[in-house]
Amino acid sequence: MPTTVSGPIKSVPGERRDRQVHTGASATTGMDIARSLRAEARRANERRLLVLAGDPDRTRERAATALDLADVPSAETTVVGPEPFLDCEHHDQSRAEELLGRTRTAVVFDAHEELRPDAVGRTVGAVDGGGLYVLLAPPLETWPEERDGFDASLAVPPFGVEDVSGHFRRRFVETLRAHRGIAIVDVDRGTVEQDGLTDPPPSRPVPSPTPPTDAWFRSETYAQCLTDDQRDAVQAFESLQTAGEAVVVEADRGRGKSSAAGLAAGNLAAADRDVLVTGPQYRSAAEVFVRAAHLLEAFGVDFTRDRSSDPQRLDVAGAGCVRYAPPDEAASLPDGPDVVIVDEAAALPVRRLEQFLDAPAVTFATTVHGYEGAGRGFSVRFRDRLAESDLAVTDVSMTTPIRYSDADPVEVWAFRALLLDARPPVDQLIEDATPETVEYRQLSAADLLADTHLLREVFGLLVLAHYRTEPSDLARLLDAPNLTVRALTHEGHVVAVALLAQEGGLSASTRATMYEGGRVRGNMLPDVLSTQLRDEAAGVPVGQRVLRIATHAAVRSRGLGSKLLSEIRAEFADHVDWVGVSYGATPELVRFWADNGYNTVHLATSRNATSGEYSVVMLDPCSDDAAALAARHREWFQDRIAAVLSDPLDDCDPDVVRAVLRATDGERPVSLSEWEWRLVAGVPGGASVLDTNPKPFRDLTRRHLSHPADATALSPREERLLVRKVLQAHPWSTVTEELAFVSERECMRTLGGIVERLTRLYGDPWVQEELDRHL
């Protein structure tokens, strides 16, 4: 039963009264609960969550009073929200990342104007043990029915914000009411719905980790380790002194992995090693430099910083250094580092991560749960590449929190509310799944909300299907009116899942806005075809775009992904014009989609910032209108592909080019003039004629790679030679080395032989006679 809060709190001698409320209203009504929460949190070295629900001004006033009563200094408080209503640090929700890597005694999260799930995920981890996370919200009974700025971002045309369901916020409120350590105060009624007190035993002093007996790092290093996990991670880093070693550290947020990396970096620099640190942003790696500098000071060695705060380089006198470079610069291993430390590796594309495998020694540290996300790139694809490398790999897992007790209820709540710990089903439950044993299911948001295990399995698989998954993706899954979920289940457990987005069906005015360069939310495929490829009518047909698709790792290569796509097409074929997809192209993925009936209509000319690959757009038409749409875009793609491959796409993987062209599914004849055919026929007499006019050779290559008259005419290596030399115009020397020819002469002769075979396949009889004159 809610309890009534007593009347106004009077000042008590010795209390902090230094906060100023900028609303102009008095901060009254008893908030003794805050004092009790803080006291309990400090005794147990845990955090507590205080929800103040009601009128915006009143909740802000009560927040000021609560923090005063809880004896939280303004200097240790941050407000995250639209207004800086306290005399303390303030950030908008859009700038919540400013709290990453920092520690605060209290964070006040003002959710009155909007609730951004990513901002919650980024800020809750900043609260130290003994601290408070204060959430300001509208009345909880009506909050799920309200629509805010974040909800508006989920409404993509032709849907409006009124179509957003509010399921995420409803579930969010339910978790607040269900979890330990969370106090809820209705400031309008003056009642405490729940006090959040758990009566935990006092925290016991944690003994310092025992240093390893055979340590190579100096003894001062292990004296700075706070947990056994951290000690074990630091000891694993000792292997980096030897070339050919790799260390992979996976940890939840707040486990001290960056600090452990910093302790290792300090030791290595003191031992005359050049340590290169990189990460998606400097702030994610800043703790490495803080900890390395502290350790060097403990060593008593002379070293310099390139700047007094946030240093990006530490130089040890007469020894090595620790230096930072952003990933695009660090990937070339500038100045030959001895060791590379990649922080938050899961946030980097696989293509970028692979480049660090050339370092003498390397560590990859990443967050397992949390907004940073460990998605397909790191957990699946890159792990495979790492295993194939020549590096000896040491795996380290860190689970013990550094700054608060491992029984902390706020972390438990955050993991549940944001599904940061979502996982697919364990292998044993689904290892017998086959296309014949699975059930196709249409999963509504209501279905997912009603079954927590089902929601965790679905979201856990979707996390693995993408390079980076954030809490906002959970809100989209539950609330976005254009999204639907389809899955295959085996004995009730999810083995494959797809997230679909409705696109197209746009009004004339929306299509005009899009065509003229205006921003229209969602509708990625119509946007690309309309804005970039100048086809305004592309927004008329209605389609379903496959945003993500994933199959459980234990049952891959059994045809379950194809089974799911087949069921999706069968369900939607009579209701939409097309099913489509856009993704970072790899040879394997392009072949998968092509085998399932999808055809190439576009290949982006810049790499995707998330995947690091060139994105391909593919369509599977379901209606005559969509068939016409796909046909004209296939034609236009064939028209332009040779030109873009020799310029913006000249570094595209030749196997991607081969797969993308083969997936165009359009037989376009070779159209060469008589003179161009004579040029082609002359290549066997000297491949240098290719430089005279590359156009006919490109047309012939495009024809064969997209729709070969004889698919066995050329080997994969010969097709790669066509891509690299004819389509991408790489120098002979580069092609010779990449494709392992003995000499440039051999490379030229091979190309001449290839052109001869293609000429006989596609040339008229008189062309073959011309060819014979040069043999």
From Swiss-Prot:
GO cellular component entries = cytoplasm
Q: Which residues form a coiled coil?
A: none
Keyword Signal recorded: no
Q: Which Enzyme Commission numbers does its entry carry?
A: 2.3.1.193
GO biological process per UniProt? rRNA acetylation involved in maturation of SSU-rRNA; tRNA acetylation; tRNA wobble cytosine modification
Keywords assigned by UniProt, alphabetized: Acyltransferase, ATP-binding, Cytoplasm, Nucleotide-binding, RNA-binding, Transferase, tRNA processing, tRNA-binding
Q: Which reaction does it catalyse?
A: cytidine(34) in elongator tRNA(Met) + acetyl-CoA + ATP + H2O = N(4)-acetylcytidine(34) in elongator tRNA(Met) + ADP + phosphate + CoA + H(+)
Q: Where is the composition biased (Pro residues)?
A: 199-212
Compartments it resides in: Cytoplasm
Q: Which Gene3D superfamilies match?
A: 3.40.50.11040, 3.40.630.30, P-loop containing nucleotide triphosphate hydrolases
Residues that bind acetyl-CoA: 549-551, 556-562, 588
Which SUPFAM superfamilies does this chain map to?
Acyl-CoA N-acyltransferases (Nat), P-loop containing nucleoside triphosphate hydrolases
Main localization of the protein? Answer: cytoplasm
The residues listed in the UniProt record as binding ATP, with positions renumbered to this chain, are: 230, 254-263, 403
Q: Which Pfam families match?
A: GNAT_acetyltr_2, NAT10_TcmA_helicase, TmcA_N
> Segment Disordered: which positions?
1-33, 191-215
Where in this chain does the record put each N-acetyltransferase domain? 438-623
- A GO molecular-function term, please? tRNA N4-acetyltransferase activity
Q: What NCBIfam families does the entry give?
A: RNAactase_tcmA_Halo (NF041296)
Its family remark reads: Belongs to the RNA cytidine acetyltransferase family. TmcA subfamily.
Described by its record, this protein's role is as follows: Catalyzes the formation of N(4)-acetylcytidine (ac(4)C) at the wobble position of tRNA(Met), by using acetyl-CoA as an acetyl donor and ATP (or GTP).
Protein name per its UniProtKB record = tRNA(Met) cytidine acetyltransferase TmcA
Q: Which organism is it from?
A: Haloarcula marismortui (strain ATCC 43049 / DSM 3752 / JCM 8966 / VKM B-1809) (Halobacterium marismortui)
Gene that this sequence comes from? tmcA
